[in-house]
Amino acid sequence: MAIIKPFKGIRPPKELVEKVESRPYDVLDSEEARAEAGDNVQSLYHIIKPEIDFPVGTSEYDPRVYEKAAENFQKFQDNGWLVQDSREHYYIYAQTMQGKTQYGLVVCAHTDDYMKGNIKKHELTRRDKEEDRMKHVRVNNANIEPVFFAYPDNAILNELIMRYAATEPEYDFIAPIDGFRHQFWIIDDDNDMQTITNEFSKMPSLYIADGHHRSAAAALVGAEKQKQNPNHRGDEEYNYFMAVCFQASQLTILDYNRVVKDLNGLSSEEFLAALKKNFEVADKGTDIYKPQQLHEFSLYLDEHWYSLKAKEGTYDNTDPIGVLDVDISSRLILDEILNIGDLRSSKRIDFVGGLRGLGELKRRVDNGEMRAALALYPVTMQQIMDIADSGKIMPPKATWFEPKLRSGLVIHKLS
């Protein structure tokens, strides 16, 4: 069962939300955050990217930077830019991208569920990134930004959400940069909140879509606080962390594509010939060609697009990892032909995800920066859940969720 609870959110007044809200901390660097914040002293970047309050070049891992985050978080509350709700709520957060809307429930999940594996992950985490997020949680005594969860489709929850979605939202704005619509409702009916809690309790698992390091950090800080509290009961706020939970079928996963700097000493003709061992190769001409189905890839090379269809027997339909296109392309193209083994460390490969599209692949090859590009069909949410259920880990650079959650709509304090 998934243990969740409502919480007293800390959030901006309606008239300030567009001043406060921001992109998440991990999708932009310090200079981008500095530019986006500009002279806006109410921007959440002063809390989630507080190095912008120091001279250019200051490390985001400088101890003073973490202290500044806490100082700014307190200032935002003192100035009324962030205000805590007087009672516990669940919230609804909707995102609309290109005419499609996905509705998330903002809840507090239990750290024990993470530790026990009831909150399932599909990515490896790095200790240095965990420690960075742990420092941020510790110093602020809060989850400033939520984790992004998926849950199996649920008709009762969907009906409840749509009932609220037909009412006036608390927040409703078009975000800069992404241009997507973001809406936010407060669930204040006790019966509705009990329904949400009950329906989640029937779910065997929740799935981390995005935010593996934030999840790990929240659980580890919760465990620390348990040890530090001789009167620990188990219902304290530090046992919970903030998540936005979406129905799996509503989520949009975009293609996460590859560009390579060289062909491992092969000519174009030799490379295409090598591909024919495991793929049906078809020249699609000079117009951009997007993969149409699983196990089909698009190759851009020498101003031409090619379709590559993996031959029968090159993958195992019973293996949740081996059947993934990211694994097929890594094994049979990047590793076997191009000798690019470790995608995380190789300098010969880069990744292009999200909304930049295949035009960005073409641009980076045409300008000579890269030698060839490989476009993949997107991973499905069902594939991610199958892998998480099997206890396995997705290959690196496999998933790109869009839209990203905006930060600053609501914050969860740990005490």
Question: What residues fall within each predicted segment?
Answer:
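Surface-exposed, charge/polar-rich loops and edge strands
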Residues: M1-S415
